[in-house]
Structures are given as C-alpha cells and as structure tokens.
Swiss-Prot record:
It holds the Pfam family DUF2712. This is Uncharacterized protein YybN.
Amino acid sequence: MNKFLKSNFRFLLAAALGISLLASSNFIKASNDNYKFHLLVPYGYGNAYSNDAFRQTTHTDNPWKVNLQKSAEGKGTIMTFWLINTGNSKIPKASKIHNVKQGSGAHYYHANSQGSHTYVALAVENNNYSASSYGIDGVWDEETW
C-alpha cells in the first residue's frame, strides 16, 4: 500500500484537487439576481426593509444592486437605500446610504465589512418628510458577482 501511494502520489493529489474544485463550485451561488421587493414606506422618515438574503462574499468591492421601478409617491421620486446586516443590531449598516431616483435603472454600490459573509436586507427611507405612507416596487441583489 505504501509503495502504491508513493508511486501514484502526484496522480492522487491531482485527482483530489480536481474533485475538491468541482465539489466547491456547487456551493458558490453568487450571481446578478433580481429579487423583487414591494415595500410600504412609512410616513415621516420611517424605514422599510426587504426580506434578507445571504451575502456570501467577503469582498466589499462586490457591489449590491437596487432598481427602484415604481413609487406610489409619483414618477421620478427619490428614495434613500442602504444594506443592513440583519444579524448585528449594534452596527447594522452594511453599506453607505444612497439616493436613487425612480425609473433611473439599476444602481450598483459597494458594501462595507459589516456586509461580508452574513445575512443582509435592503433598507429604504423617504429622502424627504412625508405625512403619508406609500408603496414602492423594484428589484435588488445582495451581491452581483
């Protein structure tokens, strides 16, 4: 047995490496997805949150995406978006805040280290004070590559 291992070590090592690469590729699911959201933005400066998704990357330069497609407030309205770390109530912001205009297409932003290898959700707030609540629709993704 020992002689077999010595004579075939390189072949066995290459086979083990190949199998591990193939097996690990099945667990990598990051892609540019379009998770739909329909959120009721509360009156005032209240926040609304999407369902969470697992952001598996540890690369802060792997951008997240938001596309504000519809707003009951009207065409061209601006909303403020950011990612939150749903598992960390002390430091929840997983990205900077960004203003996005309705109908302007997909916007891509970098996360911070609080958004690495954790569950995150899309957070939204009206960028100006409003006395009423209204619905918004769009798509988002926690990581795009």
